[in-house]
Amino acid sequence: MGIPAAFRWLSTKYPKIISPVIEDQPITMPDGTVIPVDATKPNPNGEEFDNLYLDMNGIVHPCSHPEDRPAPKDEEEMMVEVFKYTDRVVNMVRPRKLLMIAVDGVAPRAKMNQQRSRRFRAAREAMEKEEDKQKFVELLKKQNGKPQEEEPVEVVVKKAFDSNSITPGTPFMDILAASLRYWCSYKLNTDPAWANIKVIISDATVPGEGEHKIMEFVRSQRGSPNHDPNTRHVIYGLDADLIMLGLATHEPHFRVLREDVFAQDSRPRLCKICGQKGHDAMNCKGEAKEKNGEFDEKDAVVPLKPFIWLHVSILREYLAIELDVPGLPFQFNLERAIDDWVFMCFFVGNDFLPHLPALEIRENGIDTLTAIWKDNLPVMGGYLTKDGHADLERVQYIMAGLAKQEDAIFRRRKETEDRREAGFKRRKLADEARQRRAQGSRQIRQAAENSGPPAGFSFHKINEFPGKAPQPSITHDMVVNRQAVDQANVANKSAASVLKDQIKSMMAQGTSTPENGAESTETPAETAAAAPATEEQAAPPAALGKRKAELIEDAVAGPEASSTEVTEISESDAEPTDSVRLWEEGYADRYYEQKFKVDRKDIDFRHKVGRAYAEGLAWVLEYYFQGCPSWEWFYPYHYAPFAADFVDLGKMEIKFEKGRISRPFEQLMSVLPAASRHAIPEVFHSLMLEETSEIRHFYPDDFEIDLNGKKMAWQGVALLPFIDMPRLLAAMETKSHLLSPEDHLRNAPGKDYLLLSDSHPTLYDHITSQFYSKKQGTTKFELDPTKSAGLSGLVEKIDGYVPHGSLVYPLSRNSMPDVDYDRSLMVHYFFPDCSHTHKSMLLRGVQMPTPALTRSDIDILKGKASRSGRSYGGVPLSNKNYSGRNEPINYGPGGGQQGGRGRGGYQGGGGRGGGRGGYGGNGGGYQANGGGYYNGGNNGGGGGGYGGQPRDSYGPPPGWQPPPPPGLAGFGVGPPPPPPGAAYGGAPGGAGYGGYGSSRGGYQDNRYALPPPPPQAYQAQGQQYGQGGSRGGYQGQGNQYRGPPRQDRGYDNRGGYRGGGYRGGGDNRGYR
């Protein structure tokens, strides 16, 4: 999913959702014999699982181009690695009923745009790396003065596997599909743990993304009346959207399995250039490979990377607490609330839309949206979503609430970045100062040693400073960063001359320079090596790149370019300029003018973009909950709108047409650059390369990457032209007749496979009796769930397939054995037809897992939930907003009006009819039409409400006295000392006092007394009659008396001392 860092954010916020996987390992005997894991034994994790789903792209990618070991030499080695990895995952989970393997097939058009961006970037990065390697080899030859040995040169220039080949329609995907079918059949023949399980393989010829094909299967089984609601599911994959998909199934027994990518890896990192240990690509010298031992033995076995569980059931527990909104005018439904939360996560990032500018996962953007949702849920009258369909009129409330915070979010983001950058620069300057002092001291001592001591003096011998340093070695990092630091090098040369003068001055009396003329034998490369390593690790990406460039340039330039002076690169050279400047006024005009190339006054265009984005949100929601609503829809812009540009969403009518599913070659031509054309049939190459081709501009050799306010290129936006699909199809049609029969076969849509062993107690006989008995019936029939262990769907006979034949390994080198008597069975499989809508509900008969959260966990989470989303990601509700205006922040349309009972105080400024007074407290006041006396001491009494005749729904407390007459609503100067805790509501038609209630157990008892009257000079000010919530007093909405500046403001009609006065805090919590 397109939410970077989403998994880490979730696991940090909800720590109990993560637990380590307990894994049995194969046993190696002294004679070298390996005893495999016995997966028939009980699962060591203490729970048995029914179904395991593998999103295979998360396995194929790390196996084909690993980071911790040399890449496989060819496709056959890759397949063997895929077999090993998959076997390890299956042995961890030990599914007892079903294994489903899903490979990405043709994707919806909305996904193709993201794939196009990734693949063009990958091709350009591969080309740049290859060019860097070539330059690196040439420099090595020049430095050594002789031709480099053949082996390292071949290793350096060796081309890596093109990961763009992992795309539907390529020969590689054909090899993968055949290999997976072989391996699963082999395991069904040889592994007892596979005897009773069913295997479904959905390869790249079947349209749809792997994880969404898996979810379609789960939804189809839930719709069957024979489905077990307590089925225990595990899905393996690296994408964060698997968590959202798991929640969307509403299956409580669901886990996500993945590698613990944050665990410390004890395996040595290999250089990506030469493949050797001991250094990285930045410090590669291209030296010949050293033998490991006498016979170049392989390394000893290193610990495998651990795996972790993510428990969706425990995440549901956390969300049940965090999303709870008491006092709703309708019944709270946890399943609907979870759907809303998943929907709001799409605002922060997904694979189909650019994320909204104001929302970042690292800034707790999801918490910000959750706070807005909780505040508006009573007003909206219901949930944002229902069974995967969005209510856009209610979505408008969320966007309006976010729009009120956008200015604050952008400004606070800038402040945070500035503080972080300033802190890094301070640390950098301090480190450089330490290095200069140490270098200057070494240079002085060396100069004195080289010139010889004066007569009568002797020095202690210093062994650690040699007379002459070796020539600095050229490294890969010097080459790739040379261009970025040319300007700094020029500046450093002038600083070097200053250093020379200083050294000559210190050596003037009775000293002479060495014969070789070198004032210092300390090389800049050594100076760079003395820099602490922790700085590089802790530095932000932009600053890290700048620091590396400076150190590299010093090493390349030689001793003359080193300097003891601080030579800073100008800001324009250090990092790109953000011309939009979201933190400054007018950012919206600049944004649309620069990003969309439209007139800044064209407001209608902004609303058009907002409507297109809202349509995209509706598409994504339905895609996750019901399946792909349209294969042809896509978002037609590179950038997202602002929240303020979502206008009149409730008037939109969205209806998607299913559309046409692209064929594999059409997707290849849509997403691959010309550099990866080897994966595309040769007949189409001319369309990508020839200038006369009408679609040549779809495949630019170079393209712009807009950093869009980010620091690193990979975070930017690739400005590639969108594919005009009708033109592409028309161009391809002119070449399609030249395709070979094998190509036509690869371009055709495929079917899923169902595999099982002949030892399955019922299903094997159930299928063979229909397809391969003397009484053969139809070639396609519906499975009986009582005989298939609950599996619903249809199966079809494969033409030409005969059971109990031989199983042949499909690749050439026979890395795996053939099986003469194949005991497995293979048929085509089709999901059961689900014409009805998948309901967001728990199924009847489900038994919920044992709760994992303790009372302490719940209390802590409730405390955090009350503040969550109201700090960094948005404006705290208890404070003024960033512009200093006292107005609602998180509320959408309607402000403080909530069904005729405004919240008063900060949230709505009083509303109609005495609302709750100040924020956070059930303020002391009568509601309109006598809605009762509120407890005046709960988190501080709010301002008393006007209007209405009181009823005796709640009687006033003993000893209660009526409030003073109108006109005594506030003070304009400093308040008198507070009396004992009192809480008063307004009389009919009168301006009430805010309560002097307790603040979290502070100043409260059962005595009630009037506050002292204000000075006579101010009694006439601030009178305000009317219905409900007039503010009166200082800063009142009536006769607005503005008291002397910089004085305490007394009662700011927002409840008690501290209601904007005594402490000037405005948090309405009473005197404390």
Swiss-Prot record:
EC number(s) reported in the record: 3.1.13.-
Ranges of biased composition (kind: Gly residues): 892-911, 983-1000, 1025-1036, 1056-1072
A Gene Ontology molecular function term of the record: zinc ion binding
Classification via CDD domains: PIN_XRN1-2-like
GO annotation, biological process: DNA-templated transcription termination; mRNA processing; nuclear-transcribed mRNA catabolic process; positive regulation of chromosome segregation; rapid tRNA decay; rRNA processing
Functional description taken from the UniProt entry: Possesses 5'->3' exoribonuclease activity. Required for the processing of nuclear mRNA and rRNA precursors. May promote the termination of transcription by RNA polymerase II. Essential for vegetative cell growth and chromosome segregation.
Descriptive protein name: 5'-3' exoribonuclease 2
Enzyme superclass (EC): hydrolase
A single Gene Ontology CC term: nucleus
Coiled coil region boundaries: 118-144
Organism: Neurospora crassa (strain ATCC 24698 / 74-OR23-1A / CBS 708.71 / DSM 1257 / FGSC 987)
Lineage, highest ranks first: Eukaryota, Fungi, Dikarya, Ascomycota, Pezizomycotina
Localization annotation: Nucleus
Keywords for this protein: Coiled coil, Exonuclease, Hydrolase, Metal-binding, mRNA processing, Nuclease, Nucleus, rRNA processing, Transcription, Transcription regulation, Transcription termination, Zinc, Zinc-finger
Region (Disordered): 414-459, 509-577, 865-911, 943-1072
Composition-biased stretches (Low complexity): 518-543
Zinc finger (CCHC-type): 269-286
Bias-annotated ranges (Basic and acidic residues): 414-435
